[in-house]
């Protein structure tokens, strides 16, 4: 089972995303093993999908929610409930604002026994604080 971070989820949905081909390749090979979203990644997906400064083909909130519903209908999906607080003792040490979401997702993945799939090398580095947190860092082939 793999939890896709926001960037991986956005890349999966939008063919204009720079990493779309890579995540589709990964998804084709891995989706049947199970893939997941959580409240944080779903909210991030809607936020990014509706922001024209981030996504040139941005859509409205209702449309972004419909796309999310369609993604969740793809086989192997599981929604992970989220009970992480950033003040919990098992959250990696956060030293900068760009690590807040990463630390949250890493903690959720570890608690649920899933790996976190990301394109962000910084997440991989942060995960080294907790060696039992599996992270799959996708690279462009």
Swiss-Prot record:
One Pfam family it belongs to: PIN
- Which key words tag this protein in UniProt? Hydrolase, Magnesium, Metal-binding, Nuclease, Secreted, Toxin-antitoxin system
Family statement drawn from the similarity comment of this UniProt entry = Belongs to the PINc/VapC protein family.
| Binding locations of Mg(2+) | 5, 102
Name under which the protein is recorded: Ribonuclease VapC38
GO cellular component term, pick one: extracellular region
Q: Does the keyword Nuclease apply?
A: yes
First-tier enzyme category under EC: hydrolase
According to its UniProt record, where is this protein located?
A: Secreted
Could you say which cofactors this protein requires? Mg(2+)
| Superkingdom field | Bacteria
Function, as annotated, reads: Toxic component of a type II toxin-antitoxin (TA) system. An RNase. Its cognate antitoxin is VapB38.
- EC number of this enzyme: 3.1.-.-
GO BP of this protein: negative regulation of growth
Q: Which GO terms describe its molecular function?
A: magnesium ion binding; RNA nuclease activity
Q: Identify the species of origin.
A: Mycobacterium tuberculosis (strain ATCC 25618 / H37Rv)
């Amino acid at each position: 089972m793999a939890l896709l971070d926001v960037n991986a989820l956005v890349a999966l949905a939008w063919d204009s995303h720079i990493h779309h081909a890579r995540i589709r390749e990964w998804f084709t090979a891995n989706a049947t093993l199970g893939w997941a979203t959580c409240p944080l990644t779903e909210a991030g997906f809607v936020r990014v999908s509706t922001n024209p400064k981030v996504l040139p083909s941005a859509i409205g909130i209702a449309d972004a929610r419909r796309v999310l519903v369609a993604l969740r209908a793809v086989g192997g999906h599981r929604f992970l409930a989220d009970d992480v607080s950033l003040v919990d003792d098992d959250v990696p040490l956060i030293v900068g604002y760009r690590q807040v979401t990463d630390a949250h997702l890493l903690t959720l993945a570890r608690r649920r026994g899933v790996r976190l799939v990301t394109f962000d090398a910084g997440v991989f580095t942060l995960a080294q604080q907790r060696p039992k947190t599996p992270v799959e860092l996708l690279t462009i082939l």
